[in-house]
Amino acid sequence: MSIDSKTSKAMARLIKNVTVHTLWIYVLAILARGATYPYQVKKKIKEMFHFNPPTVTLYTVMYRLEKEGLIRKAENGSYEITEDGKAALKKASDTLRNLSETLDHIWYNLYKL
């Protein structure tokens, strides 16, 4: 997802909302696959989800996730998801799935007219 000069302001806000503002979900999804280091989290987000979050933003998000008990830092500097983190990831996934179904319903009814 990229923003260029032809991207409307509304679309730019949407892209930011589903990438940077929900970065914590991407971090938890990566860590759900196994413990890893922050620089690897950034690399995997770029590879898997096709956006490149600012490094300082990623570290801030990971710091907050750790403070909330959703991830924990190991002695070697890697991070892993906690049970609370897994529950939060599931709830976020369910919430986004419900939103997607609602949007599908809207589109179906819009084009049905």
Language model regions located:
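Exposed, interaction-prone assembly regions rather than primary DNA-binding/catalytic cores
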Residues: 2-4, 56, 109-113
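Short, Lys/Arg-enriched N-terminal segment that forms or immediately precedes the first helix
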Residues: 2-16
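N-terminal helix-turn-helix DNA-binding core of bacterial DNA-binding proteins
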Residues: 15-57
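Short acidic/histidine-centered micro-motifs embedded in hydrophobic/aromatic stretches
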Residues: 44, 61, 106
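Basic amphipathic alpha-helical segments that dock to polyanions
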Residues: 58-60, 64-65
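A short, conserved structural fragment
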Residues: 66-74
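Basic, amphipathic "hinge/linker" alpha-helix immediately C-terminal to the N-terminal HTH DNA-binding motif
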Residues: 77-92
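Amphipathic alpha-helical dimerization/coiled-coil segments
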Residues: 90-113
